[in-house]
Amino acid sequence: DVCVAGIDLPRLIKEVQNLIQSQGKRPLMNTSMAHVLTHRRLFHSLLRAGKLGQKPVQKGPYLRHLPHFLLAKEHDFKKLPSLAPKAFRDQWSKLEPQVSRPRYKVGLFTGCLQDFVYPEQLIQAVDFLAQHGVEVSFAREQGCCGLPLLMLGEKEAAGDVARHNIRAVDPNEVDFILTLCASCGSHLKE
């Protein structure tokens, strides 16, 4: 990932992938992912349904023995995290803290992993911020940051998803936007 000559290899690989796909037929997996991730409600419904579908392959907090057609050939994932029993977004209405005289107002970008796999991290972050006088808002219209699409070479769809998320938060209502996912943060910042 790091080139001593200073060449940004990850970005170069993404651009080459994008170029190859623009000249030929896109793989079905890419087309499907682009469709699902650009339709937030569909994506979230599929994740919620996935909680039921993961039961046969769930072992503790991880999924095991996933069918190979679900994973790209170049990846050798042995274990993937299980989906949480309840997504952060489905708990927000009961969690939203009321902070009198907030020092700051923060818009929380959850990303898919934190929202659907590790909601407890977001809950702890919201509690911590509230204890320190920070008001937190959560735009339910947000979805995946789009990075998985970019990694598949779906640059246009990735940009569409990122722009949708940026529009979901009114910059006049928050002082900062916070995410616990470094990948989401760096992708949205670009």
In which residue ranges do the predicted regions lie?
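Iron-sulfur-cluster electron-transfer modules
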Residues: 1-142, 148-188
